[in-house]
């Protein structure tokens, strides 16, 4: 019988953060952790085919295994291009 592990699943919005703790069987995947967290039912803006995922800021795939104490992070898509924002800030600084 597999041992149980505890995992956190996090999803952050500008106005609200979600942090769900789940208990899973050892050998569970990132996808199983997200499903067990219930976040897919709470947030219809999460699309596992589009949202990037990580464990403590390191990119992972849905089929990767989670370990006891991991924090699975569901990332939102970027709103603006980081290069463009840096360029705009540089232009603004140069204009001063």
Swiss-Prot record:
Gene3D superfamilies: RnfH-like. It comes from the Bacteria. Pfam families: Ub-RnfH. Disulfide bonds: none annotated. Belongs to the UPF0125 (RnfH) family. PANTHER family: UPF0125 PROTEIN RATB. This is Protein RnfH.
